């Protein structure tokens, strides 16, 4: 009986997604707000801004990438914190 109970507990834990998934904004520049659910293991969101011949540009997404000089990067660790 104990084995059956233990098996049910293990199956329940495996079947349920007990991990937390981060939600980040992913709209570009001045587009309407959209969000994405980040891949497992991602624990931060980013907002990258720079200027080019089209004006000020913004990119948002999951993670915290490395950027070239001249690009402003803001990383944060709460849901939709990169809006």
Swiss-Prot record:
Belongs to the three-finger toxin family. Short-chain subfamily. Type I alpha-neurotoxin sub-subfamily. The keyword Aminoacyl-tRNA synthetase does not apply. GO terms for cellular component: extracellular region. The keyword Acetylation does not apply. GO terms for molecular function: acetylcholine receptor inhibitor activity; ion channel regulator activity; toxin activity. It holds the Pfam family Toxin_cobra-type. Residues 1-21 form the signal peptide. Keywords: Acetylcholine receptor inhibiting toxin, Disulfide bond, Ion channel impairing toxin, Neurotoxin, Postsynaptic neurotoxin, Secreted, Signal, Toxin. This is Short neurotoxin 1. Expressed by the venom gland. It is found in: Secreted. InterPro entries: Snake_3FTx, Snake_toxin-like_sf, Snake_toxin_con_site, Toxin_cobra-type. Disulfide bonds join 24-45, 38-62, 64-75, 76-81. It comes from Pseudechis australis (Mulga snake). Binds to muscle nicotinic acetylcholine receptor (nAChR) and inhibit acetylcholine from binding to the receptor, thereby impairing neuromuscular transmission.
């Amino acid at each position: 009986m104990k084995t059956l109970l233990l098996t049910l507990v293990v199956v329940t834990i495996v079947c349920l997604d007990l991990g937390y998934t981060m939600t980040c904004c992913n709209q570009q520049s001045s587009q309407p707000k959209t969000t994405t659910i980040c891949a497992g293991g991602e624990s931060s969101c980013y907002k990258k801004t720079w200027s080019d011949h089209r004006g000020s540009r913004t990119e948002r997404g999951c993670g915290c990438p490395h950027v070239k000089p001249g690009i402003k990067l803001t990383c944060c660790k709460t849901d939709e914190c990169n809006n």
